[in-house]
């Protein structure tokens, strides 16, 4: 009789899990050591990484660096380096052609260096000397970092530069679009809108949104960077001008009869009937004022924060269709048919100044961002640039074949003029210098006559409205590369825009402070001060700030007689008079010393020189 085997007898023992020899894991940088069988094809070679281990450096091994302050060697941190630079490979197995940090030119480092190493520092205590060594080492490291990060800065604008003898005006937009990157090339586009043209356009203060209105009632607003349409309506009425208000959420449209306010969804919010037959619009962002010029000859200021008419000024010069603002002092410039340009402020009923610019009527006016130069064009086919720093004299003049109907300045001082269907752009030496009218910087021909011009803020883009629609041109060097994120941020969110609106309303500048020279607001008003002092004296009957008369103290033993008191009073008065005379003589000698020539001594024959 067969019996079942006892457990553990004639049965192969189970393998112990702990005693099982596991396969050693292979890392991706280790070589393949598995032997291949006969006839089997070897697999694809694995990416190897011949990175050698860095040997540990002893703690006492320092890099000796000579110091100019003391003979004690400095101990800066040693940068990490591979033993074999050829073995620096990435995960893909490729080798970095430029290992290590990028070299920095010595000239650039010296520009950021704040320590003059040519001067010898005085020897001092050991503690102070060590502090100076550490400060010098930190300063050197900081200057190197600043020089390396200078490549990321964009303060210097990049203009279009041709080769020797090449005229940049012959470079067309297609060549520029082909040469720039994809993101910049997308900023050049054409909107074919011949059905409702001609068009007027306006960019928001942040430069992110574009609004345009056609003469046949077409009004639209969009984010021109992403090409996302915000609103599009037809007001069924002629549109003469269009402007963004303090943000892209509100839009002012000058229609045939009255002024209308819309939001970014195309919903009409207000209809201002006191501003009738408006031809041109300008918005003053720091004062929240919307300036309107009408066919009736009135210049009207509307405070959009409270919805009140601040001032309605009669220019007494007929129809107003040429208007521009000075961004520096918020003064409105109006061009008239008699060839003059008048400067207006809501605080005055008369113009602040009048400038005779042309023999015929003025067709266009533009002021640069610094408020220094003004460009005008007239019916006499002349383009002039005036200096607004008190002289109001023309700096340069150029006669154009057809005359400019529209002018605009960029943030970097470029001047654009629209003449028929041609757009000419002139560039200067810099932001603070006037544009040179000798040779145009760029030239472009459009599909129809120009009806509106404006440079996009913080972008090298020029928007042109014409009878065929809207054209966005690329103009290298036109926009300001650096923007203030707290003032005009193109990338702000909705919450940031709301917070900025509250802050801007709290910091709103009153309309009464608009003047030609804003620096005069920080000066003392001497006339008002003297008038107030005179009124105070009349009200009190005496001058509270007058110096009290001298009263001699009484003395004993007969020395306080009447003659003695009069003598002492006269002595004090004479002393004060002598001080005044001495001070006037010193001032006179100082003036004579300044007027005295520093050259050779004058000759008696100089009076015969003419």
Swiss-Prot record:
<dbReference type="GO" id="GO:0042274">
    <property type="term" value="P:ribosomal small subunit biogenesis"/>
</dbReference>
<feature type="repeat" description="WD 4">
    <location>
        <begin position="315"/>
        <end position="354"/>
    </location>
</feature>
<dbReference type="GO" id="GO:0005654">
    <property type="term" value="C:nucleoplasm"/>
</dbReference>
<dbReference type="GO" id="GO:0003723">
    <property type="term" value="F:RNA binding"/>
</dbReference>
<dbReference type="InterPro" id="IPR001680">
    <property type="entry name" value="WD40_rpt"/>
</dbReference>
<feature type="repeat" description="WD 1">
    <location>
        <begin position="193"/>
        <end position="234"/>
    </location>
</feature>
<feature type="modified residue" description="Phosphoserine">
    <location>
        <position position="41"/>
    </location>
</feature>
<feature type="region of interest" description="Disordered">
    <location>
        <begin position="1"/>
        <end position="103"/>
    </location>
</feature>
<feature type="compositionally biased region" description="Basic and acidic residues">
    <location>
        <begin position="572"/>
        <end position="582"/>
    </location>
</feature>
<dbReference type="InterPro" id="IPR015943">
    <property type="entry name" value="WD40/YVTN_repeat-like_dom_sf"/>
</dbReference>
<feature type="repeat" description="WD 2">
    <location>
        <begin position="235"/>
        <end position="272"/>
    </location>
</feature>
<protein>
    <recommendedName>
        <fullName>WD repeat-containing protein 46</fullName>
    </recommendedName>
</protein>
<feature type="compositionally biased region" description="Basic residues">
    <location>
        <begin position="65"/>
        <end position="77"/>
    </location>
</feature>
<keyword id="KW-0539">Nucleus</keyword>
<keyword id="KW-0677">Repeat</keyword>
<comment type="function">
    <text>Scaffold component of the nucleolar structure. Required for localization of DDX21 and NCL to the granular compartment of the nucleolus. Part of the small subunit (SSU) processome, first precursor of the small eukaryotic ribosomal subunit. During the assembly of the SSU processome in the nucleolus, many ribosome biogenesis factors, an RNA chaperone and ribosomal proteins associate with the nascent pre-rRNA and work in concert to generate RNA folding, modifications, rearrangements and cleavage as well as targeted degradation of pre-ribosomal RNA by the RNA exosome.</text>
</comment>
<dbReference type="InterPro" id="IPR012952">
    <property type="entry name" value="BING4_C_dom"/>
</dbReference>
<dbReference type="InterPro" id="IPR036322">
    <property type="entry name" value="WD40_repeat_dom_sf"/>
</dbReference>
<dbReference type="Pfam" id="PF08149">
    <property type="entry name" value="BING4CT"/>
</dbReference>
<feature type="region of interest" description="Disordered">
    <location>
        <begin position="538"/>
        <end position="610"/>
    </location>
</feature>
<dbReference type="InterPro" id="IPR040315">
    <property type="entry name" value="WDR46/Utp7"/>
</dbReference>
<dbReference type="GO" id="GO:0032040">
    <property type="term" value="C:small-subunit processome"/>
</dbReference>
<dbReference type="Pfam" id="PF00400">
    <property type="entry name" value="WD40"/>
</dbReference>
<feature type="repeat" description="WD 3">
    <location>
        <begin position="274"/>
        <end position="312"/>
    </location>
</feature>
<dbReference type="GO" id="GO:0000462">
    <property type="term" value="P:maturation of SSU-rRNA from tricistronic rRNA transcript (SSU-rRNA, 5.8S rRNA, LSU-rRNA)"/>
</dbReference>
<keyword id="KW-0853">WD repeat</keyword>
<feature type="repeat" description="WD 6">
    <location>
        <begin position="399"/>
        <end position="436"/>
    </location>
</feature>
<comment type="subunit">
    <text>Part of the small subunit (SSU) processome, composed of more than 70 proteins and the RNA chaperone small nucleolar RNA (snoRNA) U3. Interacts with DDX21, NCL, NOP2 and EBNA1BP2.</text>
</comment>
<dbReference type="GO" id="GO:0005730">
    <property type="term" value="C:nucleolus"/>
</dbReference>
<keyword id="KW-0597">Phosphoprotein</keyword>
<feature type="compositionally biased region" description="Basic and acidic residues">
    <location>
        <begin position="7"/>
        <end position="19"/>
    </location>
</feature>
<feature type="repeat" description="WD 5">
    <location>
        <begin position="357"/>
        <end position="396"/>
    </location>
</feature>
């Amino acid at each position: 009789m067969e019996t079942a085997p006892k457990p553990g007898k004639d049965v192969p023992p189970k393998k112990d899990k702990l005693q099982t020899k596991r396969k050693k894991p292979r890392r991706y940088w280790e070589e393949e050591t598995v032997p291949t069988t006969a006839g089997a094809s070897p697999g694809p070679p694995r990416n190897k990484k011949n990175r050698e281990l860095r040997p540990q450096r002893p703690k006492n091994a320092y890099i000796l660096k000579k110091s100019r302050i003391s003979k004690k060697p400095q101990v800066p941190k040693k940068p990490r380096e591979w033993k074999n630079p050829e073995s620096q490979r990435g995960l893909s197995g490729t080798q970095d052609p430029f290992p290590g940090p990028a070299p920095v030119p010595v000239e650039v480092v010296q520009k950021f260096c704040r320590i003059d190493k040519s001067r010898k520092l005085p020897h001092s205590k050991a503690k102070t000397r060590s502090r100076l060594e550490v400060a010098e080492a930190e300063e050197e490291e900081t200057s190197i970092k600043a020089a390396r990060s200078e490549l990321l800065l964009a303060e210097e604008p990049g203009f279009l530069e041709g080769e020797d003898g090449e005229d940049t005006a012959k470079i067309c937009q297609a060549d520029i679009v082909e040469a720039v990157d994809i993101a910049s090339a997308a900023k050049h586009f054409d909107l074919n809108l011949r059905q409702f043209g001609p068009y007027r356009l306006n960019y928001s203060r942040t430069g992110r949104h574009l609004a345009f209105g056609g003469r046949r009632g077409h009004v639209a607003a969009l984010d021109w960077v992403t090409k996302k349409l915000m609103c599009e309506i037809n007001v069924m009425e002629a549109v003469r001008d269009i402007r963004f208000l303090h943000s892209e959420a509100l839009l002012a449209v000058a229609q045939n009869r009255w002024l209308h306010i819309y939001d970014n969804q195309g919903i009409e919010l207000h209809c201002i009937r006191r501003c009738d037959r408006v031809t041109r619009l300008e918005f003053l962002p720091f004062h929240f004022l919307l300036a309107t010029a009408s066919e009736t000859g009135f210049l009207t200021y509307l405070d959009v924060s409270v919805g009140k008419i601040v001032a309605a000024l009669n220019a007494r010069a007929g129809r107003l269709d040429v208007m521009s603002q000075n961004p520096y002092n918020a003064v409105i410039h109006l061009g008239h048919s008699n060839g003059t340009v008048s400067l207006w402020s809501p605080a005055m009923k008369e113009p602040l100044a009048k400038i005779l610019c042309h023999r015929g009527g003025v067709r266009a006016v533009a002021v640069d961002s610094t408020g220094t130069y003004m460009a005008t064009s007239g019916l006499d086919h002349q383009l002039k640039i005036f200096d607004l720093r008190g002289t109001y004299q023309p700096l340069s003049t150029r006669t154009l074949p057809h005359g400019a109907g529209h002018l605009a300045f960029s943030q970097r001082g470029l001047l654009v003029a629209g003449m028929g269907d041609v757009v000419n752009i002139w560039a200067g030496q810099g932001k603070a210098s006037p544009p040179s009218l000798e040779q145009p910087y760029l030239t472009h021909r459009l599909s129809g006559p120009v009806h509106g011009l404006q440079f996009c803020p913080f972008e090298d883009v020029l928007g042109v409205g014409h009878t065929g629609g809207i054209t966005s041109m690329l103009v290298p060097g036109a926009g300001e590369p650096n923007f203030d994120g707290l003032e005009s941020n193109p990338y702000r969110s909705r919450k940031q825009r709301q917070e900025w609106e509250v802050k801007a309303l709290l910091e709103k500048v009153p309309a009464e402070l608009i003047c030609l020279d804003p620096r005069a607001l920080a000066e003392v008003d001497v006339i008002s001060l003297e008038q107030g002092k005179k009124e105070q004296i009349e009200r009190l009957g005496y001058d509270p700030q007058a110096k009290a008369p001298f009263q001699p103290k009484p003395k004993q033993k007969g020395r306080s007689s009447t003659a003695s008191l009069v003598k002492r009073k006269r002595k004090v008065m004479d002393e004060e008079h002598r001080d005044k005379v001495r001070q006037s003589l010193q001032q006179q000698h100082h003036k004579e010393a300044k007027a005295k020539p520093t050259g050779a001594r004058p000759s008696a024959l100089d009076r015969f020189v003419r």
